[in-house]
Amino acid sequence: MTTADVIDRYYETANAGDWDAWCDLFTEDQVMDEQLAGHIESLATLRPMMAGMGRAYSRFQNVPKHIVVDGDRAAAITHISARSKGIDVEADAANYFELRDGRIAYTANIHDTVPFQPFMEG
């Protein structure tokens, strides 16, 4: 897959709630800097975390508005629409990706944390 294909698949699998397929897009030694979950190293750590997404969110959509690809790197501006514990979440976000051998080796996401506060506190 090309970098663009991997990034498209990242959002397709997330929006389908297919977190196993989503995790398959990452290298075993992946590093993620996630706005809410913090610094996450290794696919072995990430995969069980993502297994809980279906329980944490009754609805989760992360829709890309603009994607830029430069070789093995990409960035996306997205909009998140989610529902957790009866609370709707709407937030704009930015994602940065570095790929190695056709898989995501590093990613970071940045977004306003205020819309997620009721979920994080409850």
Model-derived regions: residue spans:
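A short hydrophobic beta-strand element
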Residues: 69-80
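Short, cysteine-centered beta-strand-loop-beta hairpins and adjacent loop/turn segments enriched
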Residues: 82-90
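Residue-level signal for well-ordered, solvent-exposed loop/turn and beta-edge residues enriched
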Residues: 31, 87, 103-105
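Short beta-strand segments enriched in hydrophobic/aromatic residues
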Residues: 26, 80-82, 95, 111
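A solvent-exposed, acidic/Ser-Thr-rich amphipathic alpha-helical stretch
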Residues: 19-71
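Short acidic-aromatic low-complexity motifs
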Residues: 1-28
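Short beta-strand edge/turn micro-motifs at domain boundaries
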Residues: 96-118
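Short, surface-exposed coil-to-beta transition loops
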Residues: 61-62, 89-94
